[in-house]
């Protein structure tokens, strides 16, 4: 699987689009807001800036993209005025892979600029927004051009499927699964862990060259509390998706060999794995590292014991996951819209049944870093 070509959130603003099904990601941004605010406040207090470089990495599309930028600008503006300083110009860079729906973002900019002027008094001559296409697992910006880097719900995606998972032996390494599970052999766990180490180190090293000394970075992504990568909090949503896919295999709608050869380019690390890679690179000080529980549906459904509640929460989770992974499934399995609809209908039922018994939650890790001088 060529991750850079096939990984993108569902485009547009239709019923299965990311724009309409990103409540969980919005909740994650909201939970991390105090940490973002603290970091932005420190930058504004410690630097008299005429121009401020801000990058949102893995920006995707939809309402979350510009809302987080608006909030960061609010924070800078509030602190600057409190200190009696002029508000700096904003150089905003929105980054994602080449296949991201940048057009959706660009079409939203006129209304965004209008709101900036009406609500905040910030004219177009004070805010410059650009799209930057490419992988953040490598350099994206000139040296020392950024003051603040934000990334949310992106760094759990790997740059590639871990090498070696496509076994040449007769028996597949991770048979019947699409990600790490309780039945996965140690070699699968090791391959995923090593890929994360390589990717995250590359990310940190690249940003260390692009941020000014004293620059800040707040990263938020899926993780886990346990050192065991097979716990429910880190991989059970993939396990349930595999169950839905295998039900289609049993009916002859999907080839089993296709399932055995699919491995999600995803990894939910524990805090210790993150610390090790940051210390290895040596360019940043860890200011904060915290974990938060997030409901699979973003907390929208409170009563899952009733038949209606079970149905509703299953559908909400299925829509959220579909908006994120459909492009990969479509590319790998080559299935049409009818089978895709059937798959996520089954997934919704499986998820609803699971959450009516156990309210498994995501663990979202938020880390605030300071670039060393």
Swiss-Prot record:
GO terms for cellular component: cytoplasm; nucleus. Pfam families: Methyltransf_7 (PF03492). Pathway: Lipid metabolism; oxylipin biosynthesis. Mg(2+) binds at residues 174, 260, 262-263. S-adenosyl-L-homocysteine binds at residues 18, 59, 64, 96-97, 135-136. Gene3D superfamilies: Methyltransferase, alpha-helical capping domain, Vaccinia Virus protein VP39. It comes from Theobroma cacao (Cacao). Binds 1 Mg(2+) ion per subunit. Catalyzes the methylation of jasmonate into methyljasmonate, a plant volatile that acts as an important cellular regulator mediating diverse developmental processes and defense responses. InterPro entries: MeTrfase_7, MeTrfase_capping, SAM-dependent_MTases_sf. Keywords: Cytoplasm, Magnesium, Metal-binding, Methyltransferase, Nucleus, Transferase. This is Probable jasmonic acid carboxyl methyltransferase 2. One of its GO terms (molecular function) is metal ion binding. The record marks 150, 222 as: Involved in substrate discrimination. It catalyses: jasmonate + S-adenosyl-L-methionine = methyl (-)-jasmonate + S-adenosyl-L-homocysteine. It is found in: Cytoplasm; Nucleus. The keyword Metal-binding applies. Its cofactor is Mg(2+). One of its GO terms (biological process) is methylation. Its EC number is 2.1.1.141. Jasmonate binds at residues 25, 156-157. Belongs to the methyltransferase superfamily. Type-7 methyltransferase family. The keyword NAD does not apply.
